[in-house]
């Protein structure tokens, strides 16, 4: 919001307001506070003073509450994703889809760790120079995680649509190579955007920042569309295909993950794309904090989805080790009576990619 009613929003002004949304500061560079302050415009303060401080106190309480909730859910999600990383990295054989899940858990873990520090610093108002660095890591981790979900959906769709090609002609180490490229591209895109928009070491360049934002927008739109197209194609193949394809646990895991991401993960990306255009509107800061909290919920929900789907057996919840639950959640063959694996499950688990 402008400091005065007559203040215009040129490129520089827009940039400073845009930055203030991320740094928990007002447009003058100071932290939001409930200390003694007066409105920046000339008006009869005796009339508006009480309403001004009441509104300001309400905003600060809401602000701190959202940050505290985000930090809390981030701590829980960090533990869950750390468990998935430990199991997939040290206790289970790696195969095509487990590599994607491992990298998705890594991106979520990085995001949640950084978000915990970021939210606590906003609440406790630590005045340090690490906010730009934290913001860069947050967006980098979000982009990386955003890449993994379309990759999982696309590869699953390929395995259903062209099973012979997938099992016979698919290059080895495809999953690891794709994940490495996604990490590298996400880092490069984030560094370019951060450098041009003044988040890193360079000065703010309005036109270069707009150019990088346009590239990021196009990239995110592609990532938003791919999971839905892949899931729709896979669902069509399962329902309308000439050969009946059984629904496995991994189908359910993918479907639930994409569904949760749609409601909890997409909003923060959409709002981030719209921020430069809606930054002048009142209340946009709290919208951004809410969608940030929702994405933290999404990152926290992924391990819960894996373990919950793995624990359901014959329509009943069963208590088993976390390793077994995670293996069941990624089981890509129909479950047989007595819990015996299908003939292709063992070969899939031994496929190192």
Swiss-Prot record:
Glycans are attached at residues 26, 44. InterPro entries: GPCR_Rhodpsn, GPCR_Rhodpsn_7TM, MRGPCRFAMILY. Residues 333-353 are annotated as: Disordered. Expressed strongly in newborn dorsal root ganglia, adult dorsal root ganglia and trigeminal ganlia. The keyword Glycoprotein applies. It is a multi-pass membrane protein. CDD domains: 7tmA_MrgprB (cd15107). Residues 1-67, 118-131, 202-213, 275-289 are extracellular. It comes from the Eukaryota. It holds the Pfam family 7tm_1. Keywords: G-protein coupled receptor, Glycoprotein, Membrane, Receptor, Transducer, Transmembrane, Transmembrane helix. It is found in: Membrane. Residues 91-96, 153-180, 235-253, 311-353 are cytoplasmic. GO terms for cellular component: plasma membrane. Belongs to the G-protein coupled receptor 1 family. Mas subfamily. Orphan receptor. Probably involved in the function of nociceptive neurons. May regulate nociceptor function and/or development, including the sensation or modulation of pain. This is Mas-related G-protein coupled receptor member B5. It comes from Rattus norvegicus (Rat). The lineage of its organism: Eukaryota, Metazoa, Chordata, Craniata, Vertebrata.
